[in-house]
């Protein structure tokens, strides 16, 4: 790269010289003579200087003279390159003390030897005076260059040199930046790799900072934990820095499995790494320091948490040596701080170490079964196993932990596929594990649904009811509670044997159905023998409606029934071939028409209750129709609404009405008076309570004034009558109680239930007909026939009763509306809603009357004083106020 600027400098200088020369003769073209042609004779011959080159040959000289006479070229025109085939003659030199060509003297010409043969035509030739061509010398008569041309030449040369220098500096700067970036890109990876390698090794064989290595081609120890870096310190350990002068030691060891190895302790490479090989000892105060690698159990299966994973190898490449550093680390947690759970496991496992403390062994995943294996042999993950035990205790004199390393480890095996968790368990319990066996059993129990409650802390200062509970007073049925309240886990399989992975029950019944049947059998607490005996005798009272309904849900399909019937009797006792649900169903299928019997018995059990419900419903409907027709207060209310509505609709098409549908009763509260509070229903109720209060006779039990009736004022009499009339109107809801019940019924459901009862009798007859062909069914047929005689009679009575009630409902609908309704029970719903509104209005009117009594009653009122009515009485020509307080018209109504 440094030669480029110099080449550029040389080319620039060359062109600068030629440029200066061209500027000096800038006014002459190439085809014009440099000096005007002189016709005078050439100057006299002067002998050439000894330093000049020899003169050309006579042939060249004569050719030159001929060319001068014919073409007369310019005297100073120079041709730098010429061809051998037709070489142009060299131009004559101007008057000069040392001319380039000598005069044409025959003697001098003859003295020179003949010229050499010309070169080939393809190669150019250079004239002998190339130096004079590059650097021409002017004669004395030529005009010297002026000062302006010299200044321009110097300026141009300096500019070119400066530009070349700047370009050179820029090129050097670019090269420097590229090298710096290349170093920065390569150095972080190397530093990170070496730093990680040093941090991951608990005992460093040599530092990675460029210091001299002990062995260039020896791999670092493999069997170290990837997380025993300086960042992870543990309680109760301290580094002993006095063990810096240790030398590398080797001691053979033997494992229980016949595996031999060498314990190698490399010396520390620097003072910074000497602490890694120091002894760990107890301190009085807790201080966090790194622990030695974990010792191995007497089992080939390592123990890990559910969140940890195995990473069998890890390779780091160190510079040009390509040295592989293998470490053991849980996958997914490299470079992270270990969880407290992992630290606790390390402490527990360290207590079981062979030497007590300070011992070390290889990682379970990277330990090779054969230490003498060839490097070319590839180990599979299956062949990787941890050491079982050590026959001899391994310890150093100064307590420094050692590492178990093979003489020449084989190449690392390929990593196994990543797994979510390692289902490994310990072969024996840890020392000092005082956990109860009950706690171990609880861990194997299935998870149940959670009961959310508030726990009460035990108190030693007071006596509580919980103190009287004994541990053995109540035993939980584990089998039942697990069956009923177990949390459904689709990934796990049940441990109670209800649904077995490989069993005969999956070949006969659907697994879900089989599971449900088993749950029902446990919940009902009934055996197959009891059910079969009740089915044979036809005793429906023994089983009950709930059990019969559950049995009916267990009915298998035709295909399942055929499979269960094909089972041999020898297979019944084999729990591996048939499950509890299949056993129960097979026992039922041994009875002829078992599920038809169950259906018939369920009908018999429900028959009495169904008949009673339907008869009661029909009685309610019948009573409701009678209440609507015969309740005087309801009819009086309809009369008041009709007359009030005709009065309001005078002059319209809705006036002079003779009847209205009961739906109008619900619209009375929508019409409000001028005050915005009193509605049309309030007005009707006020008028009715006046009329009804006047009709109620006074008795001593009804009035506290008794004998002093004549002395009471008219105001008090009017308020008392309103109070009595309000009680009569508000009692309308109690008089129409059956109407409210009938409003909750559905005519379609009553009709369908009646038809279903009638169809059930037909099913019982069908079962009796089919069982007459079987043997051993006498007791069942006897039970069915006794019910059939009574049931047919009750069904006939129920159907006739239902028909009569439906006719009455239709009649009452026509009685109020004049025609039949699509929904015959709708009239009861309308009346029920109106009664709810009427009760609310009566309460509001009662509160208004009480405020009127306490706000308007004088302390001493004269006997002849009359009270002002709450509502003004409007008397027109066609109406008058009767003495009884009712509004009488000319027609005599109300």
Swiss-Prot record:
Residue spans of biased composition, Polar residues class: 298-310, 331-342, 351-377, 390-399
Residue ranges of domain FH2 in the record: 438-864
Family matches, as SUPFAM superfamilies: Formin homology 2 domain (FH2 domain)
Region (Disordered): 41-129, 203-228, 264-440
Any one GO cellular component localisation term in the record: membrane
Membrane topology annotation: Single-pass membrane protein
GO biological process, one term: actin nucleation
Skewed-composition ranges (Basic residues): 59-68
Parts forming coiled coils: none
Compositional bias annotation for Pro residues: 41-57, 86-100, 112-122, 407-418
Localization terms from the record: Membrane
Keyword tags: Membrane, Signal, Transmembrane, Transmembrane helix
Main location as per UniProt: membrane
Signal peptide: 1-20
Pfam families: FH2 (PF02181)
Listed Gene3D superfamilies: Formin, FH2 domain
PROSITE patterns according to UniProt: FH2
PANTHER family per UniProt: FORMIN-RELATED, HISTONE H3-K79 METHYLTRANSFERASE
Record function comment: Might be involved in the organization and polarity of the actin cytoskeleton.
UniProt similarity note: Belongs to the formin-like family. Class-I subfamily.
Name of this chain's protein: Formin-like protein 2
Biological source species: Arabidopsis thaliana (Mouse-ear cress)
Gene designation: FH2
């Amino acid at each position: 790269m440094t030669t480029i600027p110099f080449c550029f400098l040389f080319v620039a200088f060359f062109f600068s010289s030629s440029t200066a020369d061209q500027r000096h003769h800038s006014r002459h073209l190439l085809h014009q003579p440099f000096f005007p042609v002189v016709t005078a004779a050439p100057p006299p011959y002067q002998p050439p200087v000894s330093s000049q080159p020899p003169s050309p040959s006579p042939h060249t000289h004569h050719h030159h003279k001929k060319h001068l006479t014919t073409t007369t070229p310019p005297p100073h025109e120079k041709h730098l390159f010429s061809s051998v085939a037709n070489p142009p003659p060299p131009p004559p030199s101007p008057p000069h003390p040392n001319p380039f060509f000598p005069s044409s003297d025959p003697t001098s010409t003859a003295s020179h030897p003949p010229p050499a043969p010309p070169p080939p035509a393809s190669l150019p030739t250079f004239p002998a005076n190339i130096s004079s061509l590059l650097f021409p010398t002017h004669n004395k008569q030529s005009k010297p260059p002026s000062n302006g041309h010299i200044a321009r030449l110097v300026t141009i040369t300096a500019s070119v040199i400066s530009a070349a220098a700047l370009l050179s500096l820029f090129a050097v700067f670019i090269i420097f930046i590229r090298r710096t970036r290349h170093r920065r890109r390569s150095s972080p990876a190397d530093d990170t790799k070496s730093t990680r390698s040093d941090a991951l090794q608990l005992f460093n064989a040599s530092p990675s900072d460029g210091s001299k290595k002990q062995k260039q081609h020896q791999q670092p120890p493999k069997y170290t934990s990837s997380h025993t870096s300086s960042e992870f310190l543990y309680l109760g350990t301290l580094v002993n820095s006095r063990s810096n002068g240790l030398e590398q030691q080797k001691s053979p060891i033997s494992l229980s499995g016949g595996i031999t190895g060498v314990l190698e302790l490399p010396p520390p490479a620097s003072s910074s790494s000497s602490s890694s090989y120091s002894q760990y000892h107890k301190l009085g105060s807790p201080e966090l320091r790194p622990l030695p690698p974990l010792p191995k159990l007497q089992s080939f299966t390592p123990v890990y948490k559910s969140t940890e994973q195995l990473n069998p190898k890890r390779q780091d490449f160190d510079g040009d040596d390509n040295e592989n550093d293998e470490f053991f680390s849980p996958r997914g947690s490299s470079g992270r701080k270990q969880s407290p759970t992992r630290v606790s496991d390390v402490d527990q496992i360290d207590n079981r170490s062979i030497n007590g403390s300070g011992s070390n062994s290889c990682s379970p995943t990277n330990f090779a079964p054969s230490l003498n294996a060839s490097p070319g042999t590839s180990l599979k993950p299956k062949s990787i196993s941890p050491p079982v035990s050590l026959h001899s205790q391994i310890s150093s004199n100064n307590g420094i932990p050692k590492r178990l390393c093979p003489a020449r480890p084989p190449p690392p095996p390929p990593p196994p596929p990543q797994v979510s968790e390692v289902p490994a368990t310990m072969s024996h319990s840890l020392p000092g594990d005082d956990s109860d066996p009950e706690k171990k059993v609880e861990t194997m129990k299935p998870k149940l649904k959670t009961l959310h409650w508030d726990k009460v802390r035990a108190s030693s200062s007071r006596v509580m009811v919980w103190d009287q509970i004994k541990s053995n007073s109540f035993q939980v049925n584990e089998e039942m509670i697990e069956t009923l309240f177990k949390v459904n886990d689709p990934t796990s399989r049940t441990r109670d044997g209800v649904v077995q992975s490989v069993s005969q029950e999956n070949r006969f019944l659907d697994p879900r159905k089989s599971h449900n049947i088993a749950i029902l059998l446990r919940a009902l607490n009934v055996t197959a023998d009891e059910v079969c005996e009740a089915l044979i005798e036809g005793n429906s009272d023994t089983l009950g409606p709930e059990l019969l309904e559950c049995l009916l849900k267990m009915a298998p399909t035709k295909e399942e029934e055929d499979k269960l019937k094909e089972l041999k009797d020898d297979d019944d006792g084999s729990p591996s071939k048939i499950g509890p649900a299949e056993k129960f169903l097979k026992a039922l299928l041994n009875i002829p028409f078992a599920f038809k019997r169950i259906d018939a018995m369920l009908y018999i059990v429900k028959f009495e209750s169904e008949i009673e419900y339907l008869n009661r419903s029909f009685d309610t409907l019948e009573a409701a129709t009678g209440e609507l027709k015969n309740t005087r207060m309801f009819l009086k209310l309809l009369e008041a609404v009709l007359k009030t509505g005709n009065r309001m609709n005078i002059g319209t098409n809705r006036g002079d009405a003779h009847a209205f549908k009961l739906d109008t009763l619900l619209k009375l509260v929508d019409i409000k008076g001028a005050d915005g509070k009193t509605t049309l229903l309030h007005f009707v109720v006020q008028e009715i309570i006046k009329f009804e209060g006047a009709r109620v006779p006074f008795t001593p039990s009804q009035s506290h004034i008794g004998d002093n009736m004549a002395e009471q004022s008219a105001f008090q009499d009017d308020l008392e009558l309103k109070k009595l009339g309000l009680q009569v109107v508000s009692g309308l809801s109690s008089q129409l109680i059956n109407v409210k019940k009938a409003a909750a019924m559905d005519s379609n459901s009553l009709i369908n239930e009646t038809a279903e009862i009638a169809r059930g009798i037909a099913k019982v007859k069908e079962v009796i007909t089919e069982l007459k062909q079987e043997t051993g069914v006498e007791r069942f047929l006897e039970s069915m026939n006794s019910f059939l005689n009574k049931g047919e009679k009750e069904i006939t009575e129920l159907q006739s009763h239902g028909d009569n009630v439906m006719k009455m409902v239709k009649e009452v609908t026509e009685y109020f509306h004049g025609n039949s309704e699509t929904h015959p029970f709708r009239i009861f719903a309308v009346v029920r809603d109106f009664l709810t509104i009427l009760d609310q209005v009566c309460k509001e009117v009662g509160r208004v009357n009480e405020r009127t009594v306490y706000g308007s009653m004088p302390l001493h009122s004269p006997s002849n004083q009359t009270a002002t009515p709450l509502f003004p009485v409007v008397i027109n020509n066609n109406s008058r106020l009767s003495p009884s307080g009712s509004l009488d018209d000319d027609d005599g109504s109300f």
